[in-house]
Amino acid sequence: PPNEEWIIEAENHIRPSKHNHDGYSGKGYIETSTSLNSNITFEVEVPTSGTYYIDIRYANGNGPINTENKCAIRTLFTNGRPTGPIVMPQRGKDEWSNWGYSNPVMSVLHAGKNTISIIYIKPQDENMNGETNMALIDFIRLRKGNQRPLIRLFPPIIFPKND
């Protein structure tokens, strides 16, 4: 079917967080910050090659939704290649049980095993707050696209070489 969906529970791949918040799926969730779980890799298997939309179900209670600039920003990689930014804005001060979805990133996956990585890269993933860049990740969601979109939402990321 054209609207297939896969859920990859984060806590099945990385030790779950010890926080005690409600509303998550599965058996828990993981914390990601600039120093904790800043490079997360999952292996996924899909039956057919094609376009997939990848997003993250997350919670971010670091501040109010309209100020403080404490969103968590990461770079999504698929099969070792940068695919686009993942943005997880704060959902309200101390709203750690308020779960929502990040922006979706379009990626081409091949039939069989693929790797998906969520990585904090400095300076490109720094937010305007400069200190707080953290979220709780419940799961990664893959949705099969039924056709290749005419407009690509995010251009490819080009990283400068460090000599």
What is each residue range found by the language model?
Residues 1-163:
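Extracytoplasmic
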